[in-house]
């Protein structure tokens, strides 16, 4: 089975579905991790190489088969053209051909997490050529659930 995990930032995939990744790898599944904010050096530039190396070591330990990095910077996704953004997600889905997809929870307050869900859902909608069997949301223990939408029941 092909598994595709969209991670807004480095370590979101480990914090959110690290245990699931280990379990699925032991079952023989093919795991692709797609890092949405892979552009280097914008946040903590002095630590960039160390953080990247740590991510690669963890991916190797878990058995990640494929890594896809988007050319977008952390906390700058709102400035990316929606066409370019959505196309990157569509290309990742075409490349990974996932049976299952894991996304951050849509109610997370962190804007990069919200936009990751938006981009992925555009790429995964039924009209596209390739659709997975299942889509799951994962928690990253940051601001999940804080951004609960207001549902109004009265209008003035």
Residue ranges and their predicted role:
Residues 1-6, 23, 27, 43-54, ...:
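Metal-dependent de-N-acetylase/amidase catalytic core
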Residues 8, 36-38, 140:
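Cofactor-binding loop segments of dinucleotide-utilizing enzymes, especially the Rossmann-like FAD-
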Residues 15-18, 34, 118:
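Generic hydrophobic alpha-helical membrane-span motif
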Residues 35-36, 69-73:
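Short glycine-rich catalytic loops that host catalytic nucleophiles or stabilize transition states
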């Amino acid at each position: 089975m092909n598994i595709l995990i969209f991670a807004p930032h480095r370590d979101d995939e480990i914090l959110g579905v690290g245990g699931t990744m280990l379990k699925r790898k032991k079952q023989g599944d093919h795991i692709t991790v797609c890092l949405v904010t892979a552009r280097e050096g914008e946040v903590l530039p002095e630590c960039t190489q160390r953080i990247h190396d740590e991510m690669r070591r963890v991916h190797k330990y878990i058995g990640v088969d494929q890594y896809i990095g988007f050319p977008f910077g952390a906390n700058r996704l709102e400035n990316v053209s929606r066409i370019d953004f959505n196309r990157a997600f569509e290309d990742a889905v075409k490349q990974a051909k996932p049976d299952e997809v894991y996304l951050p929870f849509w109610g997370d307050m962190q804007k990069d997490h919200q936009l990751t869900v938006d981009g992925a859902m555009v790429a995964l909608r039924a009209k596209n050529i390739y659709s997975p069997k299942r889509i799951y949301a994962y928690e990253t223990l940051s601001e999940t659930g804080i951004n609960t939408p207001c549902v109004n029941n009265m209008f003035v």
